[in-house]
Curated annotation (Swiss-Prot):
This is Cytochrome b. It comes from Neomys anomalus (Miller's water shrew). The lineage of its organism: Eukaryota, Metazoa, Chordata, Craniata, Vertebrata. Component of the ubiquinol-cytochrome c reductase complex (complex III or cytochrome b-c1 complex) that is part of the mitochondrial respiratory chain. The b-c1 complex mediates electron transfer from ubiquinol to cytochrome c. Contributes to the generation of a proton gradient across the mitochondrial membrane that is then used for ATP synthesis. PROSITE patterns: CYTB_CTER, CYTB_NTER. InterPro entries: Cyt_b/b6_C, Cyt_b/b6_C_sf, Cyt_b/b6_N, Cytb/b6-like_sf, Cytochrome_b, Cytochrome_b_C_euk/bac, Cytochrome_b_N_euk/bac, Di-haem_cyt_TM.
Length: 379
């Protein structure tokens, strides 16, 4: 009798993706983050679903409905904080996943990489709209400031902003549509993640050496299922520790004040995972220039395959490129710190220098260094 998992139309797809999938024998824990992102997405969809059962997307009741969830709903506080901190875990895994891709040259799988960039944009859009829903001070003013950036687009900008707002300011119409989009986008993300996997399995996984590993493959199950379970246990442990011991560690105290259009908070800043892009936006005095830099800071990832000048795929055997990669990581941490600081000396100049260094590293220094390494190896 043939094995059901190899013959059943549905089981066959799962079998080829998660059980009998040939995987390189030498992939490290850096390859765990794909599965962790899948777990994060499942956690977010489930907790979000239960929150949506009690949330009301009306400006008059949104804030009190979140309060009601935390105080009156059974384990509502747990669901709410799992959802809020789950987003932070999602972005930590995302940044590490993208960083792994940059370090080991995974961006040379063009379709997989481009869908990954699209996924990053979709997750950022979802997180931004989710932050608006509790209708606290930072929700309202964050929504006002970020949506207002679109007014920098020549000719159609101001019309576009009013069209997104559904009026002349961030109000009931804005909140309702943000809730609708925040609800539907995770399912679109799940579908895109499926396509991301589909393209990945067309080529097979990359590995730390960057050398094709067709001659040395092992089955995904049990080797990498066990390895992934360890990652999941650590992820859940960190997330539950954060939720149970310090749920507001990554949030903003201003968001516990109901939204007030007549009172601007002293420092408007987004959640920590947007601070690096926010710092790049703020470092350019011109509005349109800032918006372009903001978009390019993420869109630059799509250019990575074009900027790859090295003869070797991975950075594993390229010490100079490794140095620049870790300088880039330090630069991104600096930008994250600057994004949370007030706009005053010396933070302005540090932010501007860090922003210049970010683009300089990716567009100029790293490709030149790769060419230099090729030359040193007589390639």
């Amino acid at each position: 009798m043939t094995n059901l998992r190899k013959t059943h139309p549905l089981m066959k797809i799962l079998n080829k993706s998660f059980i009998d999938l040939p995987a390189p024998s030498n992939i490290t824990s850096w390859w765990n983050f794909g599965s962790l992102l899948g777990i994060c997405l499942i956690i977010q969809i489930l907790t979000g679903l239960f929150l949506a059962m009690h949330y009301t997307s009306d400006t008059m009741t949104a804030f009190s409905s979140v309060t009601h969830i935390c105080r009156d709903v059974n384990y509502g506080w747990l669901i709410r904080y799992l959802h809020a901190n789950g987003a932070s875990m999602f972005f930590i895994c995302l940044f590490l996943h993208v960083g792994r891709g940059l370090y080991y040259g995974s961006y040379l799988f063009l379709e997989t990489w481009n869908i990954g960039v699209l996924l990053l944009f979709a997750v950022m859009a979802t997180a931004f709209m989710g932050y608006v829903l509790p209708w606290g001070q930072m929700s309202f003013w964050g929504a006002t400031v970020i949506t207002n950036l679109l007014s920098a687009i020549p000719y159609i900008g101001s019309d576009l902003v009013e069209w997104i707002w559904g009026g002349f300011s961030v109000d009931k119409a804005t909140l309702t549509r943000f809730f609708a989009f925040h609800f539907i986008l995770p399912f679109i993300i799940a579908a895109l993640a499926g396509v991301h996997l589909l393209f990945l399995h067309e080529t097979g996984s990359n590995n730390p050496t960057g050398i094709p590993s067709d001659a040395d493959k092992i089955p995904f199950h049990p080797y990498y299922t066990i390895k992934d379970i360890l990652g999941v246990i650590l992820l859940v442990l960190i997330l539950t520790s954060l939720v149970l011991f310090s749920p507001d560690l990554l949030g903003d105290p201003d968001n516990y004040t109901p939204a007030n259009p007549l009172n601007t908070p002293p420092h408007i800043k987004p959640e920590w995972y947007f601070l690096l892009a926010y710092a790049i936006l703020r470092s350019i005095p011109n509005k349109l220039g800032g918006v372009l830099a903001l978009v390019l800071s993420i869109l630059i990832l799509a250019l990575m395959p074009l900027l790859h000048t090295a003869k070797q795929r991975s950075m594993m055997f390229r010490p100079f490129s490794q140095c620049l990669f870790w300088i880039l990581v330090a630069d991104l941490i600096t930008l994250t710190w600057i994004g949370g600081q007030p706009v005053e000396h010396p933070y302005i100049i540090i932010g501007q220098l860090a922003s210049i260094l970010y683009f300089l590293l990716i567009l100029v220094l790293m490709p030149i260094t790769s060419l230099l390494e090729n030359n040193m190896l007589k390639w």
